[in-house]
Amino acid sequence: RLGDSRKLCVTTDKFIGIGLHCMGKLFGTNGVRGVFSEDFTLEFVHDLVLSISTYFKEGTILVGYDGRNSSKVISKIVCSTLNSAGINSDLAGLVPTPCLEFATKTLGYNGGIMITASHNPPEYNGIKPVASDGVEISREDENVIEEIFFQKNWNQNTSEFGSTKNDDRSIQTYLDGIKSQVDISKIKSKNLKVALDLGNGAQTITAIKLCEQLGCETIAINQEIDGTFSGRGPEPTPYNLEELSSAVVNNNADLGVAFDGDGDRSIFCDNTGKLLSGDKSALLLSNYLLKKNPNSKVVTCINSGNSIDEIVTQTDSTVIRTKVGSVEVSRKMLSENALIGFEENGGFMFGKHNHVRDGGMTLALFLELISNKDIIEELA
């Protein structure tokens, strides 16, 4: 099950390989994932983090985790393993994935480790290494870590242990970064009302604060952190967002938004309660942002629709397509200095903030969009 639900191939030597042919693959499309205490054991976490420590070599690593029941105990193993390899760790605590990523970059860390299984069922957990630029490490660097892991070529010859301390700067650093990219006064002038389906996930920590700091009234549902995601599950889908649509209609809200388990993706609905697909919301934002920033680049996956082509043509911009996977989009955005990246599943990336999927940043951009133009007009 490690590596996004691929079966673990176990022989007499633990974790010889993963996949149908035991090819020695750990990373899936987004980090390393497995079922906690089955294939994603604490022993496995220790060995994986030793491999990540060997890859990072030195410096201080920022560690964060989502609200899953196993996340906090895994964070203790992560930090102690980093320390045993001579690397210091700062613990950000329970934060959304994009918060950890932005803080890693902005606060000058050598790297980050996010403990999350994103939208996977509650019994899963995972580890996502983040580079010093605030973006998930490249496929090439994933291969380096896998080689270290399977060869057990760990750097354990350290004369000094590292240490762990708490760092409470990440959340406000993240919120300040988002606010710096939008017209706060414009948003505040509209006195917007927003329905938030927090999905019992990590955006509970930041999304309400963000809306309040942008002068918005909020209606929150599924707002208690719950590692079992008892409200509607960790993955927002058209089949489990009826409560969000009803909250928008019943409270005369201007916008509704639902987040996945770790808060890097967002699904929106308009002020009539109609849900927007990930592609549709990405097109609305792209059209808005490219009109403000013509001659820009947009990166998206090969499985996204072709509607973006007309928008980029009208704004003298270009679209670049990549393999499926947020890492592919993020890394291509960096190399091309792209303004926008998106996936059809609700993952939207705004390059001026960070080249990663970010449910909070996407929400703020949507609030600015509807502050300038009625979303119903945009949808027409």
Language-model segments: which ranges?
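Phosphate-binding and adjacent anionic-ligand microenvironments
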Residues: 293-380
